[in-house]
């Protein structure tokens, strides 16, 4: 059994190890560590298979931006509790987004067959959800959960017609994504009228 002096010698090293582990955990868990694209950054172009009301088409960011701003939201997986809540919230708000000229698109790593069902039952056929099975869109937008999993982080972007990121919000709680993106979009629309 070690004596008290050798125990004291072990504690400082153990303390530094513990502090380092806590710092790493806090950094990885921080919402700020999840999304790197910031306001003013150019939004990466993408096209992907998407489902709206169970009907598959190709969603093109460039084509959507020709019509107005885009609210792009990433979510971890269809039919999970938080993602279902978020889909319902976006579906309830989609008419307000459309009144501001905006298109809403959700993106996850789910396959298109799953999204066909999700787009009808949870998105209520109000907006499209795109399949990013190869995770290229998530990577381009730095929206991978913890950067190592196959799931998207819960990250929302507002992108203006000039392909610029206007607003970014990352939080695994789905409750504020609609409220915050709507507020950013309304402020942008008000500035456009001046």
In which residue ranges do the predicted regions lie?
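A short beta-strand-turn-helix
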Residues: 47-69
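Boundary of Sec targeting at the N-terminus
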Residues: 34-36, 41
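Short active-site neighborhood of thiol/selenol oxidoreductases, capturing the structured segment around
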Residues: 61-84, 88
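Short loop/turn microsegments at loop-to-beta-strand junctions
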Residues: 44, 69, 153-155
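Thiol-/selenol-based redox modules, centered on thioredoxin-like
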Residues: 152-194
């Amino acid at each position: 059994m070690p004596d008290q002096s050798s125990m004291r010698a072990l504690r400082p090293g153990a303390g530094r190890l513990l502090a380092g582990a806590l710092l790493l955990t806090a950094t990885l868990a921080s919402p700020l560590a999840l999304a790197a694209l910031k306001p003013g950054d150019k939004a990466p172009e993408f096209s992907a298979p998407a489902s709206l009301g169970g009907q598959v088409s190709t969603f093109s960011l460039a084509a959507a931006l020709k019509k107005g701003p885009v609210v792009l939201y990433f979510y971890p997986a269809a039919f999970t509790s938080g993602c279902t809540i978020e889909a319902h919230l976006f579906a309830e708000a989609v008419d307000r987004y459309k009144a501001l000229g905006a298109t809403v698109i959700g993106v996850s790593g789910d396959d298109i067959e799953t999204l066909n069902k999700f787009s009808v039952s949870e998105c209520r056929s109000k907006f499209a959800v795109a399949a990013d099975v190869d995770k290229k869109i998530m990577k381009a937008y730095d929206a991978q959960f913890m950067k190592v999993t196959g799931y998207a982080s819960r990250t929302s972007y507002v992108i203006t017609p000039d392909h610029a990121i206007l607003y970014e919000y990352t939080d695994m709680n789905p409750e504020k994504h609609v409220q915050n993106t709507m507020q950013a979009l309304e402020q942008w629309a008000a500035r456009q009228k001046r």
